[in-house]
Amino acid sequence: MGPAIVRIGRGPSTRYGLAAPIGDLGHAWPLYLIDPRGAPREIGVLHSLAGPAWWLEMAPGAAWQSLTATDFPDAIFPGLPWFLDDLRPQGFLGRSFARRHAARLGVDSDPTNWSERAVAESLLKFGGDLPGAFVVGAESLAAALQPTEESIPADLRPEVYPRLATEALAGGLPRSSAGGEQPKFTAIVAKSDGPESVIVKFSPPLETPEGRRWADLLAAEAIAAEILRTAGFATAPTEWIDAGGRRFLEVARFDRTRNGGRTPFVSLLTHDAAFFGEMNTPWSDAAERLRSKGWLEAMDADRLVALWRFGRLIANTDMHYGNAALLLNDRPPLRLAPLYDMLPMAYRPGLENTIPALSEEMLARAQSAASPERNLALSFWQAVTESRHVSDSFRSIAEAHEKSLRQRP
């Protein structure tokens, strides 16, 4: 028996494609969106086609125009649909996810070597707790609706987090896949106002030079988030804890709600790759593209520009498109997601764990800045200078940056 024929569309625009089954999982699966209350809604059926290509057959009444927009009016995608691309295993947690499931998928343990079909199979079999709110297939939905892991009492974090860090470094945590290379794990913490889903970054041992520097940077990340939050920017709430000889930075997840719900989002990287293909340009350029094409309202576009300017003034050399995100609506405009990963990455330890000294290049950047975010950056460096939680060497760096910003005419 040959491959099944898939009818695409209706009326004069009807087209036909060949189904492309994935293993014994078939070629069509429901696509669910879990809402902020934790209730799933089927928004369509995802078809795997020969080519390869993918077709999203929208459910009646599920008018998610933002998923197809002008570039994909027939909801046919040349690869895995762009709004699912952030579900690929990536970063520190993604590699851990891949190591756990590679044998059952029959693929290499390095997810960068996975084919698109392997990625799709992982979404269908193990996609119950991935970033965002989309879930593909009934098997992963059943996993998504299982009772969540037991919450960690807030007062027990100093005891539990060091153990989870050890397990994460060993690749033994069966938790959510999220991007980024900084060692981390995910958890649910029982806070006074309810359970909170968090991503927890952690430093190497504080007794090492690289551990001390990463501890400085994690403190700086929390300070930057607070400075920006006070100025009216949406940032993910943070809290740091020193325990077990490490520093832990707890960052609230904006894609999870307190009552077990989820919020759909895509990284700026994924969105730009799908609609513009200019991912190597600054955030400020992305903001203008998003504004001009109606993907962001002017206020959010201006905020993205402001965050980019602020990042340059605090020596953040890692503002790639994976470090900004957009909250999905059923139709444009989208919304800028709360900020995360804003810290002075110019001062992170090098590949050989060398510890960077004061960067004259970063100081010169501050000297030439005329942006309104200069005062925010000044507040940031002043707060770092005054913090009791940074090392003397990093305090000296902060003092130099503060002085440089104050001296600018």
Which residues fall in each region the model found?
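Phosphate/dinucleotide-binding and metal-coordinating scaffold of catalytic cores
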Residues: 2-409
